């Protein structure tokens, strides 16, 4: 039996047994900077789960691994949540080098990969997926939990072999409980999806998730990314200037209702940005009359453009994400004088699958909308 590590007084201890004594560990599902996710089967029940092996930081001076505080924060949040659109935590084990989270197995793949394989998609169908995302975020926000890493890669399907698959929000490595009266600042997340207040190192709240939902919706309807530039400086400048538009090449078949939904999310001033409740009540999500409902049914997503632009976006992202993160980190270090070894966790969550391994084929052509 392994020695128990130092932990917060209120944190329920992690099991110190060998996870392999209780689970058969299978194939790798994904990997990140300091984490590997593998399929596993519980020996006592035969049920399948996902085992997330998080590499522990061994000392404050180390550049490798995740700090105890960050691991405990993720576990604490996962232990609080129970919602059909949010991944669930089954158990936690610990050994000398890793903390192992036994998570619900979400095996249907990414939502956007599923959409790219469809032959047609109306806005009505698209909003059924957005509504599930909003429902999951609404649950988190009622608990004052901000995800801070909402992006297509973290929106998964429980089972893709049904007409309207069940969405699961995953990866709570950057999630944070927002406390009233306590200022929270950080530079983290995936740059393409971060809100201006993150780039500018301003106080953060639940509003940052709403910005990310705006970016996700924009990409879902077009395949193009609203702020992704040819350089890291251009991307960050686009975000802080809220520089985007609805290029006719990508949005010729998009309804004004859908564009209005996006516009009201991609607002720089956090107080003027839609809240999760306001987003759920928006007529694109919840039509108030037959005319609005008909607009959603008759407006279609250009899936040919979506497939082409989404693949190009993924290719570009695989080459730009590291330099973007490094730029964000350097900016933060200048503002708050961080040690260089404190930056690694902040670029993105550690369960982010290695983007370079994905099947991206063509470079993306820069347009005025992205």
UniProtKB/Swiss-Prot annotation:
Region of interest (Disordered), residue spans: 348-370
Activity regulation details: Activated by Ca(2+)/calmodulin. Regulated by a double locking mechanism, involving autophosphorylation at Ser-318, calmodulin binding, and dimerization. In the inactive state, Ser-318 is phosphorylated, and the kinase is dimeric. Activation involves: dephosphorylation at Ser-318, release-of-autoinhibition mechanism where calmodulin binding induces a conformational change that relieves the steric block of the active site by the autoinhibitory domain, and generation of the monomeric active form of the kinase.
Effect ascribed to mutating residue 329 to A: No effect on Ca(2+)-calmodulin independent phosphorylation or apoptotic activity
Known cofactor(s): Mg(2+)
Effect after changing residue 318 to A: Loss of Ca(2+)-calmodulin independent phosphorylation, increase in apoptotic activity
InterPro entries given in the database record: Kinase-like_dom_sf, Prot_kinase_dom, Protein_kinase_ATP_BS, Ser/Thr_kinase_AS
Ranges annotated as biased composition (Basic residues): 358-370
Segments for region (Autoinhibitory domain): 292-301
Family matches, as Gene3D superfamilies: Phosphorylase Kinase, domain 1 (3.30.200.20), Single helix bin (1.20.5.460), Transferase(Phosphotransferase) domain 1 (1.10.510.10)
The enzyme's E.C. designation: 2.7.11.1
Cited function: Calcium/calmodulin-dependent serine/threonine kinase involved in multiple cellular signaling pathways that trigger cell survival, apoptosis, and autophagy. Regulates both type I apoptotic and type II autophagic cell death signals, depending on the cellular setting. The former is caspase-dependent, while the latter is caspase-independent and is characterized by the accumulation of autophagic vesicles. Acts as a mediator of anoikis and a suppressor of beta-catenin-dependent anchorage-independent growth of malignant epithelial cells. May play a role in granulocytic maturation.
Protein name: Death-associated protein kinase 2
Organism, as annotated: Homo sapiens (Human)
Gene from which this protein is expressed: DAPK2
């Amino acid at each position: 039996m392994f020695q128990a590590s130092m932990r917060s007084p209120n944190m329920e201890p992690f099991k110190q047994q060998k996870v392999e004594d209780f689970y058969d560990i299978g194939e790798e599902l994904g990997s990140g900077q300091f984490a590997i996710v593998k399929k596993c089967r519980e020996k006592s029940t035969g049920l399948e789960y996902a085992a997330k092996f998080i590499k522990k930081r061994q000392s404050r001076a180390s550049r490798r691994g995740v700090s105890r505080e960050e691991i405990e924060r993720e576990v604490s949040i996962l232990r609080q949540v129970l919602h059909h659109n949010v991944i669930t935590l089954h158990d936690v084990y610990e050994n000398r080098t890793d903390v192992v989270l036994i998570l619900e197995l979400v095996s249907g793949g990414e939502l956007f990969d599923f959409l790219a394989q469809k032959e047609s998609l109306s806005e009505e169908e698209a909003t059924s997926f957005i509504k599930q995302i909003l429902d999951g975020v609404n649950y988190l926000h009622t608990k004052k939990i901000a995800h801070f890493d909402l992006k297509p890669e973290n929106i998964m399907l429980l089972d893709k072999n049904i007409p309207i698959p069940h969405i699961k929000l995953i990866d709570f490595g950057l999630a944070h409980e927002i406390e009233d009266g306590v200022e929270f600042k950080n530079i983290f997340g995936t740059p393409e999806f971060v809100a201006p207040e993150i780039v500018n190192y301003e106080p953060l709240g639940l509003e940052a998730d709403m910005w990310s939902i705006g970016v996700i919706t924009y990409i879902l309807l077009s395949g193009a990314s609203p702020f992704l530039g040819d350089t890291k400086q251009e991307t960050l400048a686009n975000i802080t200037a809220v520089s985007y538009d609805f290029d006719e090449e990508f949005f010729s078949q998009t309804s004004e209702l859908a564009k209005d939904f996006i516009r009201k999310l991609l607002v720089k001033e956090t107080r003027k940005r839609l809240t999760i409740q306001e987003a759920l009540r928006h007529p694109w999500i919840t039509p108030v009359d037959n005319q609005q409902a008909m607009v959603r049914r008759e407006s279609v997503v250009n899936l040919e453009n979506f497939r082409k632009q989404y693949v190009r976006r993924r290719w570009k992202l695989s080459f730009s994400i590291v330099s973007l993160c490094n730029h964000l980190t350097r900016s933060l270090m200048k503002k708050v004088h961080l040690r260089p070894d404190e930056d690694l966790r902040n670029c993105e969550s550690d369960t982010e699958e290695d983007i370079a391994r994905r099947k991206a084929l063509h470079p993306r052509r820069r347009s005025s909308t992205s």
